[in-house]
């Protein structure tokens, strides 16, 4: 099993459990160059809020889009957008990535900005 298949296996197990709970998910995806965050409805059919370093307004404010500072900016942005829509409680879906580095920075920034998970 290669690295990507193992990550997808971990993500599938976590998502299955979150679907059973019927929780609104804060999903994180990272690539070497960018980081993405989405708040997804409990049934999984609708993206309620999204933010990423691909967005021009966010990318222009950052020195680099693939570091912890960028992840923190995305965490803050996703939390602000979710709170505007009345979403306060979410479950954190790390998509099989280790809770470390950029993923952790995004989660910490989202918590500081008011999201609860």
UniProtKB/Swiss-Prot annotation:
What keywords tag this UniProt record? Ribonucleoprotein, Ribosomal protein, RNA-binding, rRNA-binding
Which domain of life does this protein belong to? Bacteria
Gene3D superfamilies named among the record's database cross-references: 3.30.420.100
Annotated GO biological process: translation
This protein's GO cellular component annotations are: cytosolic large ribosomal subunit
According to the UniProt entry, its GO molecular function terms are:
5S rRNA binding; structural constituent of ribosome
Q: Which family does it belong to?
A: Belongs to the universal ribosomal protein uL18 family.
How this chain assembles, per its entry, is: Part of the 50S ribosomal subunit; part of the 5S rRNA/L5/L18/L25 subcomplex. Contacts the 5S and 23S rRNAs.
Protein name, per record:
Large ribosomal subunit protein uL18
């Amino acid at each position: 099993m290669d690295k990507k298949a193992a990550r997808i296996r971990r993500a599938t197990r976590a998502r299955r459990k979150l679907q059973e709970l019927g929780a609104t998910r804060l999903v994180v995806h990272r690539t070497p160059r960018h980081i993405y965050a989405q708040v997804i409805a409990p049934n999984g059919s609708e993206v309620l809020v999204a933010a990423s370093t691909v967005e021009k307004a966010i990318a222009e404010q950052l020195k680099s889009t693939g570091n912890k500072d960028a992840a923190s900016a995305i965490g803050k942005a996703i939390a602000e957008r979710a709170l505007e829509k009345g979403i306060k409680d979410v479950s954190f879906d790390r998509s099989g990535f280790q809770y470390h580095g950029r993923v952790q920075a995004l989660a910490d920034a989202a918590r500081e900005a008011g999201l609860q998970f």
